[in-house]
Amino acid sequence: MKKLVLLRHGQSIWNQENRFTGWHDVDLTEKGREEAQAAGQLMKRHGLRFDYAYTSVLKRAIRTLWIGLDELDQMWIPVTKAWQLNERHYGALTGLNKAETAEEYGAEQVHIWRRSYDTPPPPLDETSPYHPRHDPRYASLKPEQLPATESLALTLERVLPYWNERIVPTLRDCDNVLIAAHGNSIRALIKHLDGLDDEAIMKVEIATGDPLVYELDDALAVVDKHYLRERD
């Protein structure tokens, strides 16, 4: 039986400040580091060992992975960092306080931007320092690959091809794979793995620092799914 473990990064600085983060690269808070450490210890208690790991190119996910692998004494395993596993891009909302945004645009409109499957927030202006075109980590990408905003549907459009082209072959070759990523990139994977419809996936909440374990057969069909903390 193969295992795929999905781990949402620990609390970030902008999570703590209640700001829309998206592709902006903020680090973990002390609480976030403790959540990552606890996740690693939890995986260790349950005897999980990994052959390969994936993460995004954002430090809150990368550091969560590092801390988790350190607890497992597995920092030596191969790791691929991929922009396709980044958080959903929140467009012009990036950096804004969520409560203040609701006051400005109305709570209902902000709820639609946050929780509808296919309605993205207003796009980020290319002159904004938050636009990925100014970030050297995306220098090799074509302009049309760089989002100025995303819905969950658009996030899925970049996550799913990466899943099929890179992660699936790794799972066929390896027994256990760990993905440390973000709430919405993980939500995109869950939608695919669980076969959820557009409405159902928007109700799924992803806990920070709690490993979600999928047990897969050799055809990569889901046999079992559980949060590790439920079995602790």
Curated annotation (Swiss-Prot):
Pathway: Carbohydrate degradation; glycolysis; pyruvate from D-glyceraldehyde 3-phosphate: step 3/5. Its EC number is 5.4.2.11. Residues 116-137 are annotated as: Disordered. GO terms for biological process: gluconeogenesis; glycolytic process. The keyword Cytoplasm does not apply. Keywords: Gluconeogenesis, Glycolysis, Isomerase. Substrate binds at residues 8-15, 21-22, 60, 87-90, 98, 114-115, 183-184. The active site is at H9, E87. It catalyses: (2R)-2-phosphoglycerate = (2R)-3-phosphoglycerate. The record marks H182 as: Transition state stabilizer. GO terms for molecular function: phosphoglycerate mutase activity. Pfam families: His_Phos_1 (PF00300). Belongs to the phosphoglycerate mutase family. BPG-dependent PGAM subfamily. Catalyzes the interconversion of 2-phosphoglycerate and 3-phosphoglycerate. HAMAP family: PGAM_GpmA. Homodimer. This is 2,3-bisphosphoglycerate-dependent phosphoglycerate mutase. It comes from Alkalilimnicola ehrlichii (strain ATCC BAA-1101 / DSM 17681 / MLHE-1). The gene is gpmA.
